[in-house]
Amino acid sequence: MTKIIEVKVEELNALPATKIVESENVQAKFVQMYNAIWGTDKGEQMYHKEVFNFQKLLRDNPDLADSTKMSLYGCFLDIAVNGLTLDQTGHPLCYILSRSSKTGHKNAQGYDIYEKRAYVSVTGYGELTMRMRAGQIKYADNPVVVYEGDHFKASLVNGIKNIEYEAQCPRTSTKVIAAFIRIVRNDNSVDYQWLMEGDIERLKHYSEKANSKWNDQTKRRELGKANALYTSNNGSIDPGFLENKMIKHAFDAYPKVRTGKFTIMDSDQEEEEIIDYGLVDEDKVNEPV
């Protein structure tokens, strides 16, 4: 019989942000969830590793530590749920970020009240790891960035996708014109996915919309600035940034993978199942906030 571990909201709120993960109940909940979800006994080992990574992230990003204690707690448990790591070396699998979110309450003037909440953002490489582990694919090659001057041809013949590619050596341009990735399914069939210049511009526009702000003078929302990485490569998109986008785009049409309640993935996901985070708030037991 599984032991019920309760984590009280008021106890979380009384702790400094970096100390949340050192709570005995938080440790027990992380280990319990990790072992149960992944069928292993390595939860204790992973807990200590991720405590170090979590606390380092908060020390390196003091602004992140101002997020609600509840959301920081949820993010830490999502590392167990997602089976990823916060280790930032090499190709990071995920980050912890923060954003302003509505609380559901209004102030005396009738305006929405916001608070800063942390969330886990899964990178393309993190999503690739999760999909391989879920058995959706056998493996995928590293994304290939195509530059002006390279030979590149994408085709679809009788329902079969194919790519012709040859890099120009020496390279004469740093302008990025496309990217593609080769995916091998579990039945050993091959799937190619690609992004052309028009697709990259579309993603850039989405970034502008995501950063839009309300203008009190014009009484309408106005487009914001796109992520600087869309133009940081001498006006072209950053190659590493595009590789990450390429992986995420490649799985748009694939089935969903399980993620934690405090996790966001760029590729579209259907509503996920509710996961017990062991929270106790007044009369509400084991209900994620």
Regions found by a protein language model. Give the residues of each.
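Glycine- and charge-rich intrinsically disordered segments
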Residues: 1-35, 261-289
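Binding-interface segments
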Residues: 18, 22, 26-258
